[in-house]
Amino acid sequence: MSADCCFSTLLSAAQRGWLACDGDEALLSLALPIEGIDPLLALPQLAEQESLQVLWDSAPGLCLAAAGPCQELELAGSRRFEQAQRFADLCLSRLHDTAADSPAHARPRVLLRFRFFDQVSERRRSEAVVPSVQAVLPRWQLSRQGRRGWLRLNGVVSSAADCREL
């Protein structure tokens, strides 16, 4: 498939996704199948200017790279795990997936990072404090199972022009 054909397909999918939103601000998720790509090697290109960079490699053959936040929430307190789950559920329920027929490994994911102890020692109070829970729907997500890969772009859209920019 040529690059122009892929771009045209993605642009059409973005416009259909926007029309399905009925003019309301929404989370739009675009996906494109990519054969034989290694998420580890592609992560530096995805994450050039991004503060969030994640690589997850799990047997049997699933690999995921993610970069940049599309939606994020930092939490603390005793109900942080419950609130993180609620945030993940809300993000995924608001998401308009233009490639709903993609395989399970390619579907949008909310990534969670936990710190299990809520206390910060006196020595570390001056250092940058890592939140107890950080929940992120990444802007870029690249997943691969076997040789089947998918590149996904998530973004907030509030107009047809946002779809073209995405």
Where are these regions (language model features)?
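Signature of the chorismate-utilizing enzyme
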Residues: M1-L166
